[in-house]
Amino acid sequence: MITGRDFIITSLQSWDIAIGSNAKDIAKEISRHNRVLYVNTPVDMLNYLMHSQSPDVQRTKTLIKNKKNGLRQITANLWTLDCPFCAFPVNSFPDGFLFDAVNRLNNKRICKHILSAAQELQFTNHILLIDNDIYRSFYAKEFLKPRISIYYRRDNMTSAFWKKHAPRLEPLLCSKSDLVATNSPQLAEAVKSYNSNCHDIGQGVDLESFRDG
């Protein structure tokens, strides 16, 4: 069991999601013996304009208006972080240079906000866990400089949201991660060629085999 470490978790699933969330369950389990900062992905500008009454947009508006950093303490060892800004809606961009350039800007801004919160919490030598967030965490390893970077794959990437960019980006994200974890043998087999340090952990979060010493 890993204890006494600092974890930063980036996920597409908002902490305030009404339904059950595998990402939240993982964060809660890890926080039993470690400190966890769970990052809610920012609202993009398109959703900000088109879905102004949604809870995520309303929360973003409140943060911007009150000039708050969005850091909330959930338990003694667990915090969530909202972003007081909007991200560029890059998913509609053609795949290639333009997408990469703007996506990197999104990543840089998000990670700058994360680092500010991590510094406030006095996180050190943190472990980064990217929960299926291929786009907005693609450059997180470079910008956050974690002690260990883990990509957790729990989706087949077959939905329309992933079709344009994920086939190119996911192999790259797998390759540069220190390890890849999946929740099924099939998902592990699909990406094992990109990273030999790939493990099927089912629905659990036992990270003992990933200990870095």
Cite the ranges covered by each PLM segment:
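An aromatic- and histidine-rich active-site surface loop
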Residues: 96, 107-111, 126-144
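Membrane-proximal helix-turn-helix segments that form the acceptor-binding/catalytic region
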Residues: 26, 109-119, 123-125, 161-183
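Nucleotide-activated donor-dependent transferases that construct or modify glycoconjugates
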Residues: 1-23, 42
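A short, active-site helix/loop in glycosyltransferases that binds the activated sugar's phosphate group
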Residues: 138, 177-200
